[in-house]
Curated annotation (Swiss-Prot):
The keyword Cell wall biogenesis/degradation does not apply. It comes from Sorangium cellulosum (strain So ce56) (Polyangium cellulosum (strain So ce56)). InterPro entries: MinE, MinE_sf. Keywords: Cell cycle, Cell division. Prevents the cell division inhibition by proteins MinC and MinD at internal division sites while permitting inhibition at polar sites. This ensures cell division at the proper site by restricting the formation of a division septum at the midpoint of the long axis of the cell. The lineage of its organism: Bacteria, Pseudomonadati, Myxococcota, Polyangia, Polyangiales. This is Cell division topological specificity factor. GO terms for biological process: cell division; regulation of division septum assembly.
């Protein structure tokens, strides 16, 4: 091996590296028994912090779920608001010209 061969070594193509990384991620997700992402508890905590900046919420009245539907993951966040908070949400929605807010 000459010194020039050392400098001419071919680097792996980025597509190959990306494919290998994706295979690792897919294998890791498939191996997880619950199918729940690692980041879900942290995501739930951060979402609750953001919501609590704007509304008073009861943490027991919040649910976060991830559902798989074919090749799509759906993140569902349910927050139960008090009646006064619902009225404020409806008023804000009507001012913005948004569609009616669904009642529970």
């Amino acid at each position: 091996m000459s010194i020039m061969d050392y400098f001419r070594r071919s680097q792996p193509k980025s597509a190959t590296v990306a494919k290998e990384r994706l295979q690792i991620i897919v294998a890791r997700e498939r191996a997880r028994p619950t199918g729940e992402p690692d980041y879900l508890p942290r995501l739930k905590q951060e979402l609750l912090q953001v919501i609590s900046k704007y509304e008073r919420i009861d943490l027991d009245q919040v649910s976060v779920n991830v559902e798989r539907s074919g090749d799509c993951d759906v993140l569902e966040l349910n927050v139960v608001l008090s009646e006064s908070e619902r009225a404020a949400v409806r008023a804000a929605a009507s001012r913005a010209g948004a569609a009616a807010v669904r009642n529970c």
